[in-house]
Structures are given as structure tokens and as C-alpha cells.
Amino acid sequence: MTITMLKSKIHRATVTEANLNYVGSITIDKNLMDKANILEYEKVQIVDIDNGNRFETYVIAGEKHSGVICLNGAAARMVQKGDKIIIMSYCDLTIDEANKFNPTVLFVDNKNNIEKLTNYEKHGEII
């Protein structure tokens, strides 16, 4: 038996673009992808903090250190430029693996610069 666990999370990223006419996906700054342990073409869940939308897409790499977070294609209708989003990927692990596993959690500022990288998320409110 396996269980689906949080693998990677980029918390409170700011949407820099929404491009309806691009082939569907989310473009993420390659540096953020590398630090968060997210691969190109990996399936991700997006949660828009501002409007509550939740949806899935896949990742394409954006220019390193550009801060780009761009929703493309149909996903562009789910967000607006400036929205805060949470980007999450998951993995399937056995129970034994899950008990030893820690996710990669990346906190970013308003310009999508890395503020904190951790393997643990303290539960509580962010002010």
C-alpha cells in the first residue's frame, strides 16, 4: 500500500503573468524549481489564496532568477496577476517511506525571492 504525501511546496508565490494564449502549464523560475525539488513537466496543484481556486497543471522552467510565476493556457483564467498562490507537488510512498520522509518547503517574498527553505512547516497563521 502507498500513501500520497506532500513532496514540494512553494508558499505564497506571486503570480507575475497570466498568458491565456500559451500552451497550458505554469512557468516557474528555474531557481525556485531547483530549490523546491520540482521537475520540469511535473504535475502540480495550484491553490490561489486570493480567490480560493484549486487546480492542477504541469511545470515548465522559466528563466533562472527571474522570479517568473506565469499561469498559461486555460489555467490563466483561474488567477490574476498579483494573486498569491501555493504550488504543491506530491509523491506516492509506502507507509515506511512516508514515516521517514520530509517535504521541501520554500517560502518566498512578494517578488518571489527565497526567504526560507525548510523540510518542515510549523503549523499556524501567517500574518
Curated annotation (Swiss-Prot):
The keyword Cytoplasm applies. It is an enzyme of class 4 (lyase). Its main location: cytoplasm. One of its GO terms (biological process) is alanine biosynthetic process. Its cofactor is pyruvate. The keyword Lyase applies. InterPro entries: Asp_de-COase-like_dom_sf, Asp_decarbox. Is synthesized initially as an inactive proenzyme, which is activated by self-cleavage at a specific serine bond to produce a beta-subunit with a hydroxyl group at its C-terminus and an alpha-subunit with a pyruvoyl group at its N-terminus. GO terms for cellular component: cytosol. It catalyses: L-aspartate + H(+) = beta-alanine + CO2. Substrate binds at T57, G73, A74, A75. GO terms for molecular function: aspartate 1-decarboxylase activity. The active site is at S25, Y58. Pathway: Cofactor biosynthesis; (R)-pantothenate biosynthesis; beta-alanine from L-aspartate: step 1/1. The modification Pyruvic acid (Ser) is found at S25. Binds 1 pyruvoyl group covalently per subunit. It is found in: Cytoplasm. Its EC number is 4.1.1.11. HAMAP family: PanD. Heterooctamer of four alpha and four beta subunits. Catalyzes the pyruvoyl-dependent decarboxylation of aspartate to produce beta-alanine. Belongs to the PanD family. This is Aspartate 1-decarboxylase.
